[in-house]
């Protein structure tokens, strides 16, 4: 089975590090296979596949997508609370780096504001899922006779996912794709590594909802 890039990002920690190294935009390419993307870009698919195989960590264990309760619980536990916790810390780090290194030519000016804006949008988005969409999905699994209309709520969530993808591109642009200048401090290093992890998690989160969870109710 040919796996999509989004499947790889969702299943294997560290995949985005390899993709960034080869300048593969994993957010826009999530629905394409590695062969498709490398063919268009003229990259060596075999080399990239070997680098992916050499990643030190094994795959995450995803729950059975047919068990809606377990799948939703996984998303809540693995992503929703994690995003909230990490964004709060990253905003503080970004403010510190911008304040201390504002005169550096490669300082990520505007990153703290971009992270704060992402926090507000994600908080609103995840609250709608937690309070409205996910409970309705659980009810539909519990009661097969339920006729709760979910097409429009899911459509709205998909549109907001597109907005999150735009926010991810903004973070990548502000950080030069998370490329650290030489000799920067530990806070700057932690900021970029933490933001890169946030992006990796968010891409995987969106992929699991768009490609696995939502289609079961559309």
How would you label these PLM feature ranges?
Residues 1-218:
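Small-residue-biased structural context
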